[in-house]
């Protein structure tokens, strides 16, 4: 036997011996029934209850600390520009084996067909569903000419074009027998007329029985590969990252590993800052909104009101954070601003070129500024409560960029 074979044999024996040991080292914390076969593993677990993080990063200006030495070693790599682990498919570099495993799974076809003697697999769950409907269940086959389609919409279009007949889409809600020409109109009808059906496992609302049946496949272990694994226990294996985060919150007292915490919190703040650099059309959007409000203020039927709400929500979502990056000018009173009747009134905030002819419009516009400042203030306060070293510079930058110290110029 060669030296390498002997080493592998010894390693397998050690692993086998370790896994067969009785788990007699039990956690003494109330409500926790975890048990381990080594005292060192129990000691490691107890740190998650006491939040004792003995392994501290030695890099300057980094205060990170960890429960495990392996976590610290992985973190140290993040300070280096070199990426020790590289994808065998595309060559992308990452910091750890776990990150590499998560990345490489994106190159694999995770959703496999469960029908006997079928080896097909797909990158997306939707593609698997279309495959099952068209190939195995034959529900996407035209009964008149036997032509097979990959999507219900394609089959419906084919029937209307080549075979005529009544509308192809029928509502399957109990007691409803309405038919529709297109799939989108049917979906609109279901959303407006029938309540969503909740998934018994996750509570997600689904449109119709078919929508619920399709969603339930996402909970089927046989059709999904679970790539998100818990660092603390062998039970926690999930197909989605948010499910793993929820597992940490429920079963491990919210002790989320630093890589996941960094992704969820810091990314959220980065997205907020990105809004300010990408959206530069605030003036045109606000002008359009005011014009619509003035023209349609007196008469609007129910449909117009819905469209106005959607348009208003869309504009609100697109409002640029850039309008808050400059401090306010000196204390200009409204009376001074409108002293010359009939002239345009400028918004007193820097980097905002809006102009108004009425005091009412100016006040409403400035209230919009204040409301958004309060929203951003609330968000930054929530981030600071659970601030991490990675997130700290972003929070400070956001405060300097987004929240000026001066107060509003309008006295109410």
Curated annotation (Swiss-Prot):
InterPro entries with a match to the protein in the record: C2H2-ZF_domain-containing, Znf_C2H2_sf, Znf_C2H2_type
Main location, first listed in the record: nucleus
GO biological process: 5S class rRNA transcription by RNA polymerase III; regulation of transcription by RNA polymerase II
One of the record's GO molecular function terms: RNA polymerase II cis-regulatory region sequence-specific DNA binding
Gene designation: PZF1
Keyword Manganese in annotation: no
Annotated protein name in UniProt: Transcription factor IIIA
Signal peptide location: none
Keyword Secreted: no
Regions of compositional bias (Acidic residues) in chain numbering: 293-303
Keywords carried by this UniProt record: DNA-binding, Metal-binding, Nucleus, Repeat, Transcription, Transcription regulation, Zinc, Zinc-finger
Induction context: Expression is induced by HAP43 and during biofilm formation.
Start-end of Low complexity biased regions: 9-20
Organism: Candida albicans (strain SC5314 / ATCC MYA-2876) (Yeast)
Subcellular location: Nucleus
């Amino acid at each position: 036997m060669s030296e390498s074979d002997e080493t592998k044999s010894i390693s397998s024996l050690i692993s086998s011996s370790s896994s067969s040991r009785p788990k007699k080292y039990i956690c003494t914390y109330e409500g926790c029934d975890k048990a381990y076969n080594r005292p060192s593993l129990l000691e490691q677990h107890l740190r998650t209850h006491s939040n004792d993080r003995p392994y501290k990063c030695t890099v300057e200006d980094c205060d990170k600390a960890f429960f495990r030495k392996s976590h610290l070693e992985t973190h140290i790599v993040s300070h280096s520009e070199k990426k020790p682990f590289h994808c065998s498919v595309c060559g992308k570099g990452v910091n750890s084996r776990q990150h590499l495993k998560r990345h490489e799974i994106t190159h694999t076809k995770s959703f496999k067909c469960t029908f006997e003697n079928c080896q097909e697999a797909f990158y997306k769950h939707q593609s698997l569903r279309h495959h099952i409907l068209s190939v195995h269940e034959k529900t996407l086959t035209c009964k008149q000419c036997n032509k097979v389609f990959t999507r219900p919409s394609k089959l419906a279009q084919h029937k209307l074009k080549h075979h005529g007949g009544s509308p192809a889409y029928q509502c399957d809600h109990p007691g409803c027998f309405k038919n529709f020409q297109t799939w989108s109109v049917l979906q609109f009808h279901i959303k407006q007329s029938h309540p969503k059906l909740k998934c018994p496992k996750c509570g997600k609302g689904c449109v119709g029985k078919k929508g619920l049946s399709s969603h339930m496949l996402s909970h089927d272990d046989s059709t999904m590969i679970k790539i998100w694994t818990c660092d603390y226990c062998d039970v926690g294996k999930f197909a989605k990252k948010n499910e793993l985060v929820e597992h940490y919150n429920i079963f491990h007292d919210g002790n989320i590993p630093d890589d996941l915490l960094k992704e969820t919190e810091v990314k959220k703040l980065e997205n907020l800052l990105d809004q300010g650099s990408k959206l530069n059309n605030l003036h045109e959007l606000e002008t359009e909104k005011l014009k619509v409000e003035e023209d349609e203020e007196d008469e609007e039927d129910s449909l117009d009101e819905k469209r106005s709400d959607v348009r208003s929500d869309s504009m609100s979502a697109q409002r640029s954070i850039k309008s808050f990056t400059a401090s306010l000018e000196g204390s200009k009173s409204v009376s001074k601003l409108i002293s010359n009747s009939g002239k345009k009134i400028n918004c007193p905030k820097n980097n905002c070129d809006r102009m108004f002819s009425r005091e009412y419009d100016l006040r409403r516009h400035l209230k919009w500024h204040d409301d958004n400042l309060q929203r951003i203030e609330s968000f930054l306060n929530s981030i600071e409560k659970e601030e991490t070293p990675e997130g700290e510079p972003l929070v400070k930058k956001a405060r300097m960029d987004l929240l000026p110290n001066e107060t509003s110029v309008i006295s109410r």
